[in-house]
Amino acid sequence: MIISSTRMRGALAQLSPSVWRILAHSMLFGLAASITDLLFNFYLVSLGYANDTAGLFSTVARSAGLVLGLPVGLLIDRIGPRRSLITGLALFIAAWVALLLSPSLWAMIVAQFVVGTAYILAVTALTPLMAGVVHDRQRAQVFGLNASAGNIIGPVGSIIAGLLPTMIARAIGGGPQDVAAYRLALASSIVLTAVAALPVLRPFPTLAPDPHASAAAAERPALSFWQVLRYAWASLLLGVSGGVLLPFQNLFFRNQFGLSDAAVGLVLASSALGLGLGGLLGVPLGRRFGLRRAGGWLRMAAAPAMLLMLVPLVLPAAAGYFLRGLFVGASYPLNDALVMQATPPRQRGLAASLMSVLWSAGWAVAALVSGWVQLRWGFAPVLLAASVAYIGSALAILMLRGD
């Protein structure tokens, strides 16, 4: 334990100011996202909508990535990842303001599409931005730390989000499940997103050449479109596995176990904590077993964790949800680092956008179908489908060549 702690402190001491700025952004944006993740479905319910509408909104957001994912990648390669990230954050703020003030369902759907577009632009730009400020030998570590930065703060956001409606209701004299309470609570995420933009507003310094890198690695030939697509393929099934459940995660724990908003917030906080710890867990495993093998087997482990959620007791279900977060959180930074390592710098925007497109496609279709399935058969088929999708995504990683 002492050795691990010493290694961690040494690794953190080697991080450049550019990396610390990105980590600060990820923590703040992760805090904002955790609030919207918990409260938006409750907001829809307070407006009188049901699970199928929640699935529709999730599908609309992910469809934006599906439709605009490739143009987003071209934009990132054209204007640069930092400018793209800032543009995405500004658009995200404007779209959320419009969403909360929209007078009708159709206006909300349009605003949600813009929210999805902005989110895809922001998160897609972050991947090549990180790849551009670190050398190959540090990439897995930095990607894991960045995933942890955004996810470890998630429990704080989930707990705050669970308490915000009650606190706001007391302040304005309404009920904790009233529209006004949820609307004002969601507005806090808009403020946090604006603060998250501050660390990345200033340009990043040019990365010095890596003295340990070979000339062949520095001058890698361009990959064909199909080669890049093959590296991104695992994202499709990862999107399916997330889309069938994550848009409904709060409704699952509320409806299946009768939990309050605050209790649901605690459960989601544990999952976010698992995601954050997973990012740290994946770093030493990737170093020991390689990015491909570690990423693939860690994602495979998410399947039995999902099956644990079939147990009709809150503690086993919550434990399964935590473990799912742990294994997914450990696997996806390794897969992202693997793709960026295999892709020449001039194609990283394309590679990141393809991962986003496939992930969005899987999520959008899965969320829409899942909302319909739940109305007739409940959550059991959803959990089984997620497990199968995690297995398929893991196999897609394991079938890649080398690290």
Where are these regions (language model features)?
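C-terminal membrane-cytosol helix-exit motif in multi-pass small-molecule transporters
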Residues: 166-169, 190-211, 396-401
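Helix-loop boundary and gating motifs at the non-cytosolic
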Residues: 8-63, 227-267
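Helix-breaking motifs and short loop linkers at transmembrane-helix boundaries and internal kinks
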Residues: 80, 101-106, 258, 311-316
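Juxtamembrane intracellular "pre-TM" segments in multi-pass secondary transporters
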Residues: 2-16, 204-234
